[in-house]
Amino acid sequence: MEKNITVIKGDGIGPEIVNEAIKILDVIADKYNHKFNYTQILMGGASIDEYGVPLTDEALEIAKKGDSVLLGAIGGDTTTSPWYKLEPNLRPEAGLLKIRKELGLFANLRPAVFYDELKEACPLKEELITGGFDMMIMRELTGGLYFGKRTTKKENGQLVAYDSMSYSETEIRRIAKRAFDIAMKRNKKVTSVDKANVIDTSRLWRKVVSEVAKDYPEVTLEHMLVDNCAMQLVKDPKQFDVILTENMFGDILSDEASMVTGSIGMLSSASLREDKFGMYEPSHGSAPDIAGKNIANPIATILSAAMMLRYSFDLDREANVIEEAIEKVLKQGYRTSDIMSDGKTLVGTKEMGDLIVANM
């Protein structure tokens, strides 16, 4: 198989962690007779420094022509970086919003996987997490409150702010279908999260998701109110397989789930459109304070590369090899500084990548 991958190393620790992911992909290519062609583009602060904008039209066109995008991290220190003295539409994160919109990425997948080997890092009681857990949060990315009309105006002598939230049947149906498709590859359970006892968009959400579920009789569907889901994530995380929800709820719940796992340095993510194209990136930020020190955890980025193999290229076997190698390294006791605990062996970014290669 030959695939063209657009690489955006980005800012901060981005270049270091992406280099380790490419190292892993190259091993996969050699082992299974694939060919991955990499084309690098700039985005975020790196693009601002070079071109004065967070994403050039030329870079965007390159990304559109590829089969997928592998991204490191975008942004810098918001209190000290000159990038954040620019207008909002010229700041690093504006490039990320633009590329998501222009590439039509509407579905955000964020796995929250807890490894039994990292239980010391988890804030939950041991009896809640023994044996680990593995859930996938599917968040709608282009609709809802974040993309609705908004205004602030003066009424009766005081400021009043308005935000509007809307979802169409089409928007809900396409994200629901993607969630059920992914559940079919996993444990065949979807938990659809809404606020249908109060909000009209949630009532429509529940109706459309229930209709889509009829096409997937093998998958168990349950509906859960968002406040209950927030509680259940810390009370019994092992009950979840695929959590399907709208934009704002997904934003909040995915951050909560990441904290439950113990380290955001372990969490990958994918943003997909209706075909096989996707953009893959770690859930964490650019960590400018540790950039260039060879101490960043590359595992989230390497797991993002594994997601790319699975969801964009249909290479499930190859993705499994990467994920199993990471588990082996953790069982052997190797840790980067963010997941370090007593009695374990501290390694750097490059060393962690090499250890994963050695276990493949």
Annotate each predicted stretch with a short phrase.
Residues 141-143, 147-186, 190-191, 196-198, ...:
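Glycine-rich phosphate/pyrophosphate-binding loop and the adjoining helix
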Residues 33-57, 231-233:
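N-terminal beta-loop-helix "entrance" segment that forms/cooperates
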Residues 49-162, 248:
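N-terminal glycine-rich phosphate/adenylate-binding segment common to multiple enzyme folds
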Residues 6-23, 28-29, 155-227, 239:
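Glycine-rich phosphate/diphosphate-binding loop of Rossmann-like nucleotide-binding domains
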Residues 26, 30-34, 65-68, 101-108, ...:
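Generic secondary-structure signature for well-ordered alpha-helical cores
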Residues 11-14, 67, 138, 179, ...:
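Buried hydrophobic positions in well-ordered alpha/beta secondary-structure cores of metabolic enzymes
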